[in-house]
Amino acid sequence: MVLYFTGTGNSRHIAERIAHALNDTLISLNDRIKSGDITPLAVNGRLVLVMPTYAWRIPRIVRDHLLRTELRGARETWFVMDCGSEIGNAAKYNRALCREKGLVYMGTAQIVMPEDFIAMFNAPTVEEARRIVAKAEPFIDRAIAAIRAGHMFSPPRKKLYDRIASSAVNPVFYPLFVKANPFTASDVCIGCGKCEKLCPLNNITLQNARPVWGSNCTQCMACICYCPTRAIEYGKKSAGKPRYHFEEL
């Protein structure tokens, strides 16, 4: 079984490739999290978890959902994490999650994909994004081959920077930076409701045909990157920046 969480489509693409190659079941954690569905999942064998990197670990909402969900029959578990540059020491925490869930940890693969965290960084142009994805495809192929063969992923690097990023930075990143209040919608908003539909935490509601953000945000960037009229901004940090979602490529 392949479970994935995605903000702007990178993880969905990787998960679809893996599920297709392995002829395996593909399930969206976005849908389960949005609907509050924590019914047991009948995995019955290998489990592949695909997700973006949030502050050098897996997203907290994904970890929380997995801890609350019974994964029946799951054993060998592979993590595939996409990122804009690196995943830090996420593997340490993925291994710990497996211990907590009674799963056999089979490693963490890093896949560099186009940056989408425009609340802090710049997204690439479409042409740049296509080149990044083309470079990522062989790494996805390697991950597929390892999973198919039942092999562990090669251990990731363990530099001091990685340990600090995942251990010291991650806990303070959420309370300091993961906030929804800078989001606004301009007059070019057409009230289509796409942002409300995509938000995995139901943190966006339409009021008078305009999106209003609550306080429960994971900064997946789906709302700002999928807005069809580019009406959404994240304060001044997103002004003038390209938007990115995988389906545009």
Language model segments and positions:
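Generic structural motif recognizing short loop/turn segments at the entrances and edges of beta-strands
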Residues: L22-N23, K179-N181, A209
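A mid-sequence, solvent-exposed acidic-amphipathic segment
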Residues: K159-G191, K197
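FMN-binding flavodoxin-like domain, especially the glycine-rich phosphate-binding loop
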Residues: V2, T6-I14, H20-R32, L41-M51, ...
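Iron-sulfur cluster-binding cysteine motifs and their immediate structural context
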Residues: T184-A185, I190-T218, A222-A239
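Active-site-proximal loop/hinge segments that shape catalytic or ion-binding/gating pockets
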Residues: Y244-E248
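Short acidic active-site motifs
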Residues: S35-D37
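Generic structural signal for beta-strand residues in well-ordered domains
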Residues: P40-L41, E70, L176, C192, ...
